[in-house]
Amino acid sequence: MTGSVRKRGDKWYYSFEAAKVDGKRKRIERVGGRTKKETETALRKALEEYSQNGEYFEIKDISVVDYFNYWFDNYVLLNCKYYTQRNYKFSLNKYILPEFKNYKLKHLTPQLLQEFVNKKYLQGMTKNYLKSILTPMVSALKYAVYPCKFIKDNPMNYIKFPKYNQSESNRTIITIQDFKKITDKYPFGSYPYIPLVIGYYTGCRISEVIGLSWDDVNFTNNTISINKILLKKENKIYIGPPKTKSSIRTIKIGQTLLNILKKHKSYQNENKLKYGSHYMNQYSKKDLIISSKENLSLPKISFICTKENGTLLTPNQIHRIGRIINDKLNIPFNFHSLRHTHATLLIENGANIKDVQHRLGHSNVQITLNTYTHVTPKMSEETVQIFENLPTT
């Protein structure tokens, strides 16, 4: 395959014959360089790319802001769940676009992005948080490579994380003693109690816990079915699907939690009588949850986690409880700590890792092993005792 160069006005151009489309000839012509020699070099490079890939690659001259907005509208909004959309939007608006708003997409080099990562590290940003704000960049630039073909390679593929101390990734485990302090502060009858004990005894995510309704509990078989979550979007509450397909699961629960739930159900029924027409009921209109004291001609959902007057709990309210536990009880806590604690206590006491994987709703065992199990003093002691108990002769 050959091509040609020519000067037109003050600019040099190169062109070559591409493959026929629908039997018609197609010729590609592009600006090559300032001189004939530069243009001939550009022609050779274009011909080499075309002969290898069957297509000519042209870097798109688009700004970072315009491209990321395009990616968000055409990929994220169409393919990602609401919480992912919200998190990506936050990372874009708070970190990525303010940093790179004056750049064109083609100028996002590995060096530039590495400097950004290093700067955030030196500012004290944790590894997990840094990963969370870089995730949309990885996805967006991957999309720019294909199917958009705006850039040839993803510069995020070459980024290296600075060395973090191993302890930085340690997760908080709530001891039995600390959990008792928490439930002493928020005893049965206070609205935080039920979501806290469900999280502790099941390892469910906060959105899964507040999404549980009474028809998800089988008091005969001692099971809970996790099949939906609650999410807040633009000050409205919606029902959504769990995080992944593997998150849809039915798990066994013990007699302790079962008894608490039975007691709570009776307590809820008493409150319905106590508040009468002032009790707040929850109805579903497709995915939207409507709270009303009136009897609406919509399907009613009896959620487990409600306040005394029937008001539905939201993730933000539970997060506020976590901050109070941190400040008032001096216990490092967030709701996800209950999930880490649940998994670790199970493994520590000999539970089968596959059972733990299913219980947590993970898609594979490695996630369970890498993320939610931790070496505790009890594990360390038992490991030592294994060798102590081995025969020496």
Q: Can you name each region flagged by the protein language model?
A:
Residues 57-60, 72-143, 149, 168, ...:
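N-terminal core-binding DNA-recognition domain of tyrosine site-specific recombinases/integrases
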Residues 123, 184-189, 202, 251, ...:
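Short, basic (Lys/Arg/His-rich) helix/loop patches that form interaction surfaces
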Residues 165-166, 173, 230, 341, ...:
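Catalytic-site neighborhood detector that most strongly recognizes the C-terminal catalytic loop/helix
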Residues 127, 131, 150-153, 157-212, ...:
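Basic, Lys/Arg- and aromatic-enriched nucleic-acid-binding interface segment
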Residues 211-217, 357-363, 373:
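A short, basic/aromatic helix-end/turn motif that makes direct DNA contacts
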Residues 8-13, 18-111, 268-300:
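N-terminal DNA-binding module of tyrosine recombinases/phage integrases
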Residues 116, 181-185, 235-240, 349, ...:
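DNA/chromatin major-groove-contacting recognition/catalytic segments
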Residues 221, 234, 240-248, 252-257, ...:
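C-terminal secondary-structure termini that scaffold catalytic or DNA-interacting sites
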